[in-house]
Amino acid sequence: YELSMTLAVLGVLLATGSLRLDDVVSHQASHVWNFIPQFIGFIVFTTAVFAETNRLPFDLAEAETELVAGYHVEYSSMKFAAFLMSEYMNMVTASALIVTLFFGGWSFPGMGRLSGWWLLIASVAVFVTKLAFFLWLFVWVRWSLPRFRYDQLMQLGWKGLLPLATVNLVWVGFAMAMRWL
């Protein structure tokens, strides 16, 4: 799923024309948010991020059959808490990337009329609200979906996400050639 995630990010970078995240946000502020023209890329990236963060339904390393021999058995107290905190920080980072790449980052329609401190406060509030939504989505998916088996995960990655990510990249290239994006 890392390859699919990379191809989805390449679609965003191709449409934006820059590798800088603030340029990606500026492009979305002056155009439409990337999840609309690249909805397939958004779905691929979000699914790959869920798999990358090892959250349910992709938490195969923490499945009941793996708990006896897993690495969590050897740690307790603060070391075990550090593992859990790193998983949650991974969720926050992944959610921040989703917001920045596909949902306009800290921009929101109508914020151009603000200036000074009001713009800063509104930008932080918009980003934190979008971030909180995707963190809620992580929790909701964990509560709602059952765990995948290894063969299902491999099939999803190679036969589902990778072809969709390739289609998204071809779509973005075609849309750029036709001057639609």
Task: Give residue spans per PLM region.
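Selective transmembrane helix interface/packing segments
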Residues: 1-181
